[in-house]
Every structure is written in C-alpha cells, then in structure tokens.
Swiss-Prot record:
<keyword id="KW-0547">Nucleotide-binding</keyword>
<dbReference type="GO" id="GO:0005737">
    <property type="term" value="C:cytoplasm"/>
</dbReference>
<protein>
    <recommendedName>
        <fullName>UDP-N-acetylmuramate--L-alanine ligase</fullName>
        <ecNumber>6.3.2.8</ecNumber>
    </recommendedName>
</protein>
<keyword id="KW-0132">Cell division</keyword>
<dbReference type="Pfam" id="PF02875">
    <property type="entry name" value="Mur_ligase_C"/>
</dbReference>
<dbReference type="GO" id="GO:0071555">
    <property type="term" value="P:cell wall organization"/>
</dbReference>
<dbReference type="GO" id="GO:0009252">
    <property type="term" value="P:peptidoglycan biosynthetic process"/>
</dbReference>
<dbReference type="Pfam" id="PF01225">
    <property type="entry name" value="Mur_ligase"/>
</dbReference>
<keyword id="KW-0961">Cell wall biogenesis/degradation</keyword>
<feature type="binding site">
    <location>
        <begin position="118"/>
        <end position="124"/>
    </location>
    <ligand>
        <name>ATP</name>
    </ligand>
</feature>
<dbReference type="InterPro" id="IPR005758">
    <property type="entry name" value="UDP-N-AcMur_Ala_ligase_MurC"/>
</dbReference>
<dbReference type="InterPro" id="IPR000713">
    <property type="entry name" value="Mur_ligase_N"/>
</dbReference>
<keyword id="KW-0067">ATP-binding</keyword>
<keyword id="KW-0573">Peptidoglycan synthesis</keyword>
<dbReference type="GO" id="GO:0005524">
    <property type="term" value="F:ATP binding"/>
</dbReference>
<keyword id="KW-0133">Cell shape</keyword>
<dbReference type="InterPro" id="IPR036615">
    <property type="entry name" value="Mur_ligase_C_dom_sf"/>
</dbReference>
Length: 458
C-alpha cells in the first residue's frame, strides 16, 4: 500500500464531518499510518472519542479557525458549500477533496480493491466478506459502513494489498473508485433526489462496471433484471450468482427456527460445499453467495470461505437482537427502502413470535415521496405497524409529504397502523399492547433504534 497522492506524511489533513461512519474510517487509516489528523463534527460521539484517543484533534462544531493549520481538507457530500470551514479553506487556497475522491485516491495504493455496490446489502456483504478474508489470513484493510465486532468497529488496517470497501452509488460516488473486483448486489430505484429515474441509476452502475480492469472480476446477482440489462458492458471476467441460475447457485435451501438458511453451494451442477448461515432471510443467502463468489475469485480455500460465512452473526443495526423484556423480543434493522423492509419483514415472519409489531421511521422526505407507492405495499407481513415522524437527515420539511400521509394510505389498505410523533408515546403504546411471545421490530436508518432501547431499559 502507498499514499502517494498525499506525498508528505508531515501534512495535516482535516476532515469536515469526521464523526460519519466512512469519514471516521478514513481518518483512522491515516492515523494508523502516522498522519497528523484533525476533524470537526456537530456532536461528540463514541466515534469522535475513539478518534481522539487515537491521536486526532477533534472540534465540536464547524468554525473557520478549525482549519487554520490544515494542508488538505476532506469533506462529505452532506457539507454545504457555505460551511465556514469550506469558506475559509477557499480563502486560504487550502486543497479540498470530497470523501469519494479521497477514498478513490487511497484505493490506488492497493492492488486488490474489492468494491461492493448495490442498492441494498452493502454493509452486510462487506462484513460477511471481511469474516471470510480474515479467516483466509489475507490481512485486508477493511472499510465498512457499520460496526463489526470482529474488527471492533468500522475499520481495520492491514498490511497486504487487499482493500475491502463499500461502494455507494449516491451522487455517483463509486465512479471515483478503482475496483479490481467490483460487486453489484442489486439495482433498485433509490436516491431519486439525485438520479432522474431508474434508467439513470442503471447508467451509473454501467459506468461502474467499466472501471473494472480486463483481468479483474465483476461479481453480480444474475437474477436481477436491472443487472441483466447492463452486464454486457463488462470487458472483465464475470461471475454471476443466484438461486435458480448463475455460475454459483444455492440449492437445497432450508431455514432453521430463526429463519437462517442452510444450503449447498453449486457450480456447474456440482456441489462445492454446504454452508449454514447465522443471519436470517433469503436476502442474506444472496449476500453470502456474493461473498462466496469473491472468495473463489480471490483463490481463497473452501474451508476458509465456509468458516468465514458461518462465523458471521451480523453487524450492528442489521437484524440486530437488542434484547428481551417479559418474553417479548426486540430486534432492530437499518432497512429504509421498501425492498429492504419487505426482506426484513419476510425474515421476521419466519422468526419465532406471536404478534409482529413493526415500528418504522421513514428516512428522508425525498425518499418517502418518490417511493411512496412502494412504501404502502411493503408492510403486509407485519401484524401491526407503528409509524414515527420522518427522519429528515440532510433535508428540510417542505410540507409536501409526511408520515401521517403514509399511515392514512396503509389504513386505507386495511392494515392496522398507528402514527405517533414522540418516541415516548410509541414506547408507552408498546408497553400497553404487547404480550408474551410478541416481536417488536424497529426499522429505519435514523434513530428509531432508541425506541427499542427505551422499551428494554424500562
């Protein structure tokens, strides 16, 4: 690995939004390599405290004086152009680089970059593959969009030429990367605040495919129609996977009492080996097939692939068991797209329970508006739906869409759905209405997980 694009290790690099999951990982990689690092964020968090302990200078709040000694400033797409630190950097002619550009340049220092893309499943698949790579002793550097117990966080710095990272399509960020193995898990309509439509999204993934060198690999879910329409763009080696078709397939699928799949891995109608998952749902069978394909393409041993897959029990906020209270189970999941919600509820339906309460917090006004019809059809596996207000994230409420409007449509469809504006009210409703053996599933990419924690910690 090398950091040629930075040139001088004595340079001071400042991260605006350093508390973010990806930005903090980049900062930690540089701290490990003895760079001088500072960063700012709006709030203190366990992530910023961890970086401080590792030697970073952390500022709470964005102020122009925070960047006075910086030689290079890295910022996220969420940072506004009138941010005082950005403004000061331009005044002082300090070099600015967005997160995706910085990560792409970092990837140039590695030979075997594995970039995992797709609308859904990136964090889980990256985490699952990380288990496989660690079992195979390839000593990878890992950058994942969640907290993974085996690496005690969201980043691991290795000494080899293997670099494993998520590749997000938002604002075409992944087109700044340099994949040797590029993975496409699925393509779905999302981020329609940036992309015009599904065809625009497919065009971005088509460009991603073209980034892979001829001696590299495209690993793709061959049963996804949107992927099928662009896979011909590949000039590299192609490995497809699926349940009923593809180079690598899952046969003889059985689910255990917690909805975790067991299956045979088949190539050319010949069984390679069997695996038993410890994460639930059909979607995780597909995620595991992607990880298996990458392992095979990287010449990892079958036993290491099996042990890696079977040692994976999930990441935080992905069908995470939060605890039990009075024999009522609480699980949290990051799902925030209708397809993800359907998959999560399908897995939850197979999980032992009497009544399934789905507590959902829509994530961003733009997504709720553009995918509204899909949101009205993805909760059918829930016995009861509880809706919190929309989590704004980077957006402002224009009054065009609301969680109440979604609730009205769900009730029109005959589903039992209740809207609340405060987490305390949701908690109290659950206390009054849940019974022995019920399952509470909190769903969303915002802070809805707090409801489950409030319930458990009564």
């Amino acid at each position: 690995m090398s950091f040629d694009f930075i040139k001088d290790k004595n340079k001071h690099i400042h991260f605006i939004g350093i508390g973010g999951i990806s930005m903090s990982g980049l900062a930690e990689i540089l701290l490990y390599n003895n760079f001088s690092i500072s960063g700012s964020d709006m709030n203190s968090s366990p992530i910023t405290e961890k970086l401080k302990d590792k030697g970073a200078k952390i500022y709470i709040g964005h102020k122009k004086e925070n960047v006075k000694d910086a030689d290079l400033i890295v910022y996220t797409a969420a940072i506004a152009s009138d941010n005082p630190e950005i403004t000061k950097a331009k005044e002082k002619n300090i070099k600015l680089m967005d997160r995706a550009d910085f990560l792409g340049n970092l990837m140039k220092g590695y030979k075997y970059n594995i970039a995992i893309s797709g609308t859904h499943g990136k964090t889980t698949t990256t985490s699952m593959l990380s288990h496989v790579a660690l079992k195979a002793n390839v000593d990878p550097t890992i950058l994942v969009g969640g907290n993974l117990d085996i690496i005690n966080g969201n980043v691991r710095v290795g000494e080899s030429d293997f670099f494993i990272t998520e590749a997000c399509e938002y604002k075409s960020s992944f087109l700044k990367f340099f994949p040797y193995i590029g993975v496409i898990l699925n393509i779905d309509a999302d981020h329609l605040d940036y992309y015009k439509d599904l065809d625009d999204i497919k065009n971005a993934f088509s460009k991603f495919i073209k980034l892979i060198p001829k001696d590299g690999y495209l690993v793709a879910y061959g049963e996804d129609k949107n992927i099928q329409s662009i896979i011909k763009e590949a000039s590299c080696n192609v490995i497809t996977y699926g349940i009923n078709s593809g180079d690598i397939q899952a046969h003889n699928i059985e689910y255990d009492e917690k909805a975790c799949g067991n299956f045979d891995v088949v190539k050319d109608n010949q069984k390679l080996f069997s695996v038993k998952l410890n994460v639930p749902g059909k979607h995780n069978i597909l995620n595991s097939l992607a990880s298996i394909c990458i392992g095979l393409a990287s010449n990892m041993k079958d036993k290491d692939i099996i042990e890696g897959i079977e040692s994976f029990f999930g990441t935080h906020r992905r069908f995470e068991l939060k605890g039990c209270k009075n024999n009522i189970t609480v699980i949290d999941d990051y799902a925030h797209h209708p397809t993800e919600i359907s998959a999560t509820l399908d897995a939850a339906k197979k999980y032992p329970h009497n009544k399934l309460f789905c507590v959902f917090q829509p994530h961003t006004y733009s997504r709720t508006l553009t995918l509204f019809d899909d949101f009205t059809k993805c909760f059918d596996n829930a016995d009861e739906i509880i809706l919190a207000d929309i989590y704004a994230a980077r957006e402002k409420d224009t009054g065009i869409i609301s969680s109440d409007m979604l609730g009205d449509k769900l009730r029109d469809r005959g589903l039992k759905c209740t809207n609340f504006h405060k987490f305390d009210d949701i908690k109290n409703y659950l206390i009054e209405n849940t019974k022995d053996g019920d399952l509470i599933l909190t769903v969303g990419a915002g802070d809805i997980y707090k409801v489950g924690e409030m319930y458990i910690n009564l």
